[in-house]
């Protein structure tokens, strides 16, 4: 991991832990989840919002005023709105995407859930997804939510990532291994 990425991940983790603890103490974890969904939707849909949190051009005051107005318009909880304002004051808004993903991980961990990123050559059927989730639940001991995507370059098979574990059963991976083995021999 590069140094800037590890720094922003560390900053995001500290804010996420603090926000989660506040939400848990005030029994508003569900509200926090709603805030995360709203903010992730805004980041995905609005390039201007992304530019606001990433750009060093805006002053602390401009960022804080804009974030406060946006938080009110989005209907964010006081905890999240105050956190974003504090992050603007400290010039830390650039870690908001990592903050949101870290918060999701903390909430899932607390609920005994885990998200598995599954990449397949073609879309999984409902039966296949259910069977895979059941198998992963037996392996991890946690409720598994699948985040499925399609990559036709895999040719066949799956690539499954659960936390730091990755299982690659794709045809592409097997062909690459075979190609490397042939290079070593010849």
From Swiss-Prot:
Pfam families: OSCP. Its main location: membrane. It comes from the Bacteria. PROSITE patterns: ATPASE_DELTA. GO terms for molecular function: proton-transporting ATP synthase activity, rotational mechanism. Coiled coil: none annotated. GO terms for cellular component: plasma membrane; proton-transporting ATP synthase complex. It is found in: Cell inner membrane. InterPro entries: ATP_synth_OSCP/delta_N_sf (IPR026015), ATPase_OSCP/d_CS (IPR020781), ATPase_OSCP/dsu (IPR000711). It is a peripheral membrane protein. Keywords: ATP synthesis, Cell inner membrane, Cell membrane, CF(1), Hydrogen ion transport, Ion transport, Membrane, Transport. F(1)F(0) ATP synthase produces ATP from ADP in the presence of a proton or sodium gradient. F-type ATPases consist of two structural domains, F(1) containing the extramembraneous catalytic core and F(0) containing the membrane proton channel, linked together by a central stalk and a peripheral stalk. During catalysis, ATP synthesis in the catalytic domain of F(1) is coupled via a rotary mechanism of the central stalk subunits to proton translocation. This protein is part of the stalk that links CF(0) to CF(1). It either transmits conformational changes from CF(0) to CF(1) or is implicated in proton conduction. Belongs to the ATPase delta chain family. NCBIfam families: ATP_synt_delta, PRK05758.2-2, PRK05758.3-2. F-type ATPases have 2 components, F(1) - the catalytic core - and F(0) - the membrane proton channel. F(1) has five subunits: alpha(3), beta(3), gamma(1), delta(1), epsilon(1). CF(0) has four main subunits: a(1), b(1), b'(1) and c(10-14). The alpha and beta chains form an alternating ring which encloses part of the gamma chain. F(1) is attached to F(0) by a central stalk formed by the gamma and epsilon chains, while a peripheral stalk is formed by the delta, b and b' chains. This is ATP synthase subunit delta. The gene is atpH.
């Amino acid at each position: 991991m590069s140094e800037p990425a590890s720094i922003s991940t560390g900053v995001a983790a500290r804010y996420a832990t603090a926000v989660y603890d506040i939400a848990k103490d005030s029994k508003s974890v569900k509200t926090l989840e709603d805030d995360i969904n709203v903010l992730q939707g805004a980041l995905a849909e609005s390039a201007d919002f992304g530019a606001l949190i990433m750009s060093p051009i805006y002053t602390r005051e401009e960022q804080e005023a804009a974030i406060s107005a946006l938080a009110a318009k989005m209907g964010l909880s006081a905890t999240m709105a105050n956190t974003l304002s504090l992050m603007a004051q400290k010039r830390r808004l650039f870690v908001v995407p990592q903050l949101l993903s870290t918060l999701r991980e903390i909430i899932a961990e607390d609920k005994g859930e885990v998200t598995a990123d599954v990449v397949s050559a073609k879309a999984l059927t409902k039966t296949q997804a259910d069977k895979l989730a059941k198998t992963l639940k037996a392996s991890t001991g946690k409720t598994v939510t699948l985040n499925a995507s399609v990559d036709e370059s895999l040719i066949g098979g799956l690539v499954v990532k659960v936390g730091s574990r990755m299982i690659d059963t794709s045809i592409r991976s097997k062909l690459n291994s075979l190609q490397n083995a042939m290079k070593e021999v010849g």
